[in-house]
UniProtKB/Swiss-Prot annotation:
InterPro entries per the UniProt record, alphabetical: Ribosomal_uL29, Ribosomal_uL29_CS, Ribosomal_uL29_euk, Ribosomal_uL29_sf
Highest taxon above the source species: Eukaryota
Family: Belongs to the universal ribosomal protein uL29 family.
Encoding gene per record: RPL35A
Main subcellular location: cytoplasm
Biological classification of the source: Eukaryota, Fungi, Dikarya, Ascomycota, Saccharomycotina
The protein's name in its UniProt record: Large ribosomal subunit protein uL29A
């Protein structure tokens, strides 16, 4: 059961992944017992990598489910937000940048930008 592929795991259901994880952990425990009699056992490495792969796929699926849950909501958990630089996260949004004070708005209405046409 060693050497599983991530693309194959992504097609499986949650229950199938959980059962495969249990099987892999049992196999790893058996291999650890065998290691006492035979020190060099290369299969342990592949089983450990397979366990990591299964856990990674499970984690990806859980995060995607939570992403769908928070889609369209105003706030979402920090670990699901887009990873930007600190400065970009603190920058004004388009709406905040477009805000104008009442006084400035009145000035813009009273004295609009002049448009000039050049004679050719």
């Amino acid at each position: 059961m060693a050497g599983v592929k991530a693309y194959e795991l992504r097609t499986k259901s949650k229950e199938q992944l959980a059962s495969q994880l249990v099987d892999l952990k049992k196999e790893l425990a058996e291999l650890k017992v065998q290691k006492l009699s035979r020190p060099s056992l290369p299969k342990i490495k592949t089983v450990r990598k397979s366990i990591a792969c299964v856990l990674t796929v499970i984690n990806e699926q859980q995060r995607e489910a939570v992403r769908q849950l928070y889609k369209g909501k105003k706030y979402q958990p920090k670990d699901l937000r887009a990873k930007k630089t600190r400065a970009l996260r603190r920058a004004l949004t388009k709406f905040e940048a477009s805000q104008v004070t009442e006084k400035q708005r009145k000035k813009q209405i009273a004295f609009p930008q002049r448009k000039y046409a050049i004679k050719a």
